[in-house]
């Protein structure tokens, strides 16, 4: 069972951050969770190296950030009637946010998928969001869509790891207030072309594919049988194909409010780059909906 009592949301006062704030406020109200809003501003030395502006401009940025943060806290309290705390931290955004997560220990971290810089084309994934996912063990919700209403449809992309699959489905159903949760298991028969080149018969290849489907079905059935579903409808989908394309096709087909994907952990030395180039990254980058990345 997912316990969601503390939520942290990052803000840079951009439109994308406003989407993230609204979603976080809705989730905090739904789960009766406390909410911590964090804004990162550059220290003076970093600001002066990156800009020709002087200290007086830096002071203006600081004052604007403090006022903007107060306004965002007031918006959250007024709109969602929740308990909210806010703070400004100095330093690079990703580093400040990771430090805040380490100290506050939220059950969920939320960030706008784009950040303050305009993306060249949708859907895109901002650098701070990417670094945050790579450098923390906290589930991270990437918000792309505006809206104050609760999620009513979700898609959990699972694989052969039953423990991870259960975790993803638990998160998907926890963030839904009610509605449909699509559980997608993409499977494939490895090395089909090599098998054909070696003269393996189509009947044998088909038998391998059926065995892969059976394994996927057993995994999904096992996960769904142990899922608490009050007010949610679970739908299992077995899709034969390469995981990235298969999952993105299912997202396009069912148009969920939220996609939930797993991030398998590597060795500690890989932390800074372990998310780069992975299946999870590519799905998170291309999915045109909110995406929750679960470690």
Language model features with spans:
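Short, well-ordered secondary-structure micro-motifs
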Residues: 48, 121-122, 167, 193-197, ...
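A short acidic, glycine-rich active-site loop
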Residues: 55-67, 203-215, 269
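Small/aliphatic-rich secondary-structure junction motif
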Residues: 1-55, 153-204, 286
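General small-molecule cofactor/ligand-binding pocket signal
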Residues: 36-38, 85-89, 141, 182-184, ...
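Short, flexible loop segments at boundaries between secondary-structure elements
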Residues: 140, 280-295
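Glycine-rich, Arg-bearing micro-motifs that act as flexible, cationic patches
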Residues: 111-131, 151, 258-285
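Short, structured interface segments
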Residues: 127-146
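Structural beta-alpha unit
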Residues: 1-3, 23, 56-60, 74-109, ...
């Amino acid at each position: 069972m997912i316990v969601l009592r503390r939520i942290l949301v990052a803000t840079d006062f951009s439109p994308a951050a406003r989407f993230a704030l609204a979603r976080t406020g809705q989730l905090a109200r739904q789960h009766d969770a406390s909410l911590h809003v964090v804004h990162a501003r550059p220290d003076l030395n970093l600001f002066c190296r990156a800009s020709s502006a002087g200290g007086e401009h830096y002071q203006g940025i600081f004052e604007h950030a403090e006022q903007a943060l107060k306004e965002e806290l007031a918006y959250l309290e007024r709109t969602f009637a929740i308990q909210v705390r806010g703070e400004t931290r100095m330093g690079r955004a990703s580093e400040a946010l990771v430090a805040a997560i380490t100290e506050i220990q939220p059950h969920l971290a939320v960030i706008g998928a784009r950040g303050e810089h305009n993306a060249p084309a949708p859907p895109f994934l901002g650098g701070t969001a990417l670094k945050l996912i790579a450098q923390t063990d906290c589930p991270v919700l990437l918000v792309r869509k505006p809206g104050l209403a609760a999620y009513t449809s979700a898609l959990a992309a699972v694989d052969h790891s039953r423990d991870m699959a259960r975790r993803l489905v638990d998160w998907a159903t926890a963030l839904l207030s009610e509605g449909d949760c699509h559980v997608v298991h993409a499977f494939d028969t490895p090395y089909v072309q090599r098998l054909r080149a070696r003269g393996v018969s189509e009947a044998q290849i088909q038998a391998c594919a059926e065995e892969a489907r059976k394994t996927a079905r057993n995994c999904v059935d096992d996960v769904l049988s142990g899922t608490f579903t009050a007010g949610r409808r679970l739908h299992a989908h077995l899709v034969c194909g390469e995981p990235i394309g298969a999952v993105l096709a299912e997202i396009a087909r069912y148009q969920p409010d939220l996609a939930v994907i797993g991030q398998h952990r590597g060795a500690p030395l890989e932390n800074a780059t372990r998310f780069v180039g992975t299946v999870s990254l590519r799905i998170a980058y291309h999915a045109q909906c909110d995406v929750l990345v679960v470690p």
